[in-house]
Amino acid sequence: MTAFRFAALAFAAAALAAPAIAPAKVTPPRVSAASFTSLASPLPLPYDEKANADAQVAAARNRALKTHKRLLIDLGGNWCLDCRLLAGTIDLPEMKRFVDAHFVVVTVDIGRFDKNGQIAARYGIKGRLKGVPAVLVVDPRSNKLLNAGHETELADARSMGPQALADWLARWAA
């Protein structure tokens, strides 16, 4: 086989494999809140500090398998403004409908980066998280992290706005 043919076959194989790992093409909802100041106040406190995170993630994965949705693991803490802004955005009616249609969501309290690190480690994230919220989008069938390298992109949510959060989530919906 010539080098050119080998290169052409390798390129074709890569092109066929790319859609399997590329973000999805789902239209995001139009969010009614123009800014975070439009969200309900006080912002939600979504993380249960006493919950058994391993059991919660396992139960959520089972629900995702049964409903053919992606698993969305939201790692954060109630002390984190960006985490609470994400939760407040997800609580908007149009976002709630969108998220419920595409994901099974589980929130996991990470304390002050000193709890439930095994959840992130299970999906290949080594060491301490770079920021929160860390959002892991998982294929429940393979238990594979679909947004590897992008899990902490919402850690500065306050600089994004509600529509940008909706757009980000839509990238990973199926």
Model-derived features with residue positions:
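Bacterial N-terminal signal peptides
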Residues: 7-18
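N-terminal leader/targeting and pre-domain segments
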Residues: 25-67
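Thiol-based oxidoreductase modules, predominantly thioredoxin-like and allied folds used
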Residues: 51, 88, 92-117
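Short pre-active-site segment immediately N-terminal to redox-active cysteine/selenocysteine motifs
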Residues: 68-71, 76-79
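Conserved redox-active cysteine motifs that mediate thiol-disulfide chemistry
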Residues: 77-90
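Structural alpha/beta surface segment adjacent to cysteine/selenocysteine redox centers
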Residues: 111-131, 141
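Non-catalytic, surface beta->alpha helical segment in thiol-disulfide oxidoreductase systems
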Residues: 129-174
